[in-house]
Regions:
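Active-site-proximal, Lys/Arg-enriched surface segment
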Residues: 1-42
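Short helix-loop-beta connector
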Residues: 7-8, 80-82
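Short, conserved catalytic/metal-binding motifs centered on acidic residues
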Residues: 12-20, 47, 83-93, 108
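Active-site beta-loop-alpha junctions enriched in small/polar residues
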Residues: 19-21, 55-57, 91-93, 113-115
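A short acidic (Asp/Glu
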Residues: 25, 94-101, 119-123
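Electropositive, glycine- and tryptophan-enriched low-complexity nucleic-acid-binding patches
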Residues: 31-79
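An anionic, glycine-rich sequence signature occurring as long contiguous blocks
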Residues: 107-171
Length: 171
């Protein structure tokens, strides 16, 4: 707000992900990406970093992520910034994280982990819709799931034709 890049009272799209930074610093830890470094959680609105918190390179990306997000969301809200949509990858697909996210936005999109419990249901889905995403053609569909008891969410499923003509499904 102080730089004039974001406007109080306006709604924004919010992206969150962990960035892996290779470094040889003495306190850096090995990452699951097989190099030594840091992996801070980074929150972005448009081209603007609105939150960043470091964590050890070898810490699971879900570790206390809900606390990091709560601090970032609260700081934005205290400054009159409202979040319309949140986008996150599968590293944020946990009940604790979803509970925090849903309280601070109108809509959220979190890529789910592959889940064998839903895999068979994917093959009986009808009405797949073809969409091009970043130049790649996907087929999309959705189902309502209760991954966490008593909390139904819409799961969007995408699949892509492989060159060997079999289909790949993932949630």
């Amino acid at each position: 707000i102080s730089t004039g890049e974001l406007n109080e009272g306006q709604k924004y799209d919010f992206d969150f992900d962990h960035q892996f930074i290779e470094t040889g610093k003495y306190d850096a830890k090995p990452t699951y990406k097989k190099f030594t470094g840091y992996s801070p959680g980074v929150a972005v609105i448009g081209d603007h970093i609105v939150g960043i918190e470091n964590r050890d390179g070898n810490t699971n990306v879900r570790f206390r992520q809900q606390d990091t997000l709560e601090r970032i969301f609260t700081r934005l809200e205290d400054n009159g910034i409202h979040i319309d949509r949140v986008r996150m990858d599968c590293g944020s697909c946990s009940e604790e994280i979803v509970d925090v996210v849903k309280d601070h936005c109108n809509h959220f999109y979190i890529r789910a982990n592959r889940c064998s419990a839903f895999y068979d249901d994917m093959f009986i889905l009808r009405g797949w819709r073809t969409e091009e995403i970043n130049g790649i053609e996907f087929e999309l569909n959705s189902i309502i799931v209760e991954k966490w008891k008593g909390k139904p969410y819409r799961l969007v499923v995408q699949r892509q034709r492989r060159t060997d003509k079999t289909q790949e499904l993932w949630e």
